Amino acid sequence: MGEVVNQRENVVVALKHSSPSRLPRGELFFTGKFLDIYFPDFQGNYVEQIASAAYLLSLSVVGVDLNEEWSRSLLREGNYGRLREYFTVGYINGPIMQAITQLGFCQTMICIKRDQQTLSNIVAGILKDVKEKCRLAKKNDLSAIVLADDIAGSHGLFFSPGDFTDIILPYYAQIAEIIKANDLYAFFHSDGDTRVIIESLIGAGYDCIHPVDTQAGLDLYELKKTFGNRVSFMGHIDIINWDDGQIAQKVKDAEDAFKEGGLILGSTCGFSMKTISDRLHALYPQWKGVKQRQ
């Protein structure tokens, strides 16, 4: 019989760079359509679908959506406690994503430059919401909160590094402080080239950076060399652009290089009907069994 590993504790050991028993794997994002197609037995039961995905794919880390009102209801009712055996991460959209939803992309960029009071008003509402969600997340035995704020593209930030430091970073620091006050780990997500802000994110209190966007030029091993054990990373595997052989080799390389921890291995894109393919089995060997359920 194989070694029984406590999923949550092993992830914590990895985040502390303290030699986990094995490198944890996980995914933060699962679309509803993906869950309904591959886990139809629990259609309409989001928590059970996530639990099934975690069990069948041997995930240690799973993400759950805390943005929608239906999810707030699940939080209030304590339903996410069903996932307590996993290192469960609730994701909350950050101030820039929420501003873009309310104002549009161009107007949000203008606000960052010229109308910071409007942005401040949006953030005030976000902070109140984050406090409530973090309190409930802890009661549901979640392990972490990820601030999801896509603020970069393939060529860098959508605004200047100076604007990030002066305007955006203080908000991120406040959110990290709220997360930590509830004894939760603080994760940060943004696609694109975020290299210029990682040092600032560490200083603001973030424990783990997702997703290590290889298509934007991020190199996991350069990041490891630069930041050492001061932060961890999650993701790294490009299941869209790499072939089976590349994925298998990248997995092996990461397992060899991160034996002391500092990495949660997973895809860079999450699971949707647009991102999954047969190549997924190179990252998650159990995928073939899940696919047969379709």
Where does each model-flagged region fall?
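Active-site donor-binding segments of glycosyltransferases and PAPS-dependent sulfotransferases
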Residues: 53, 57, 66
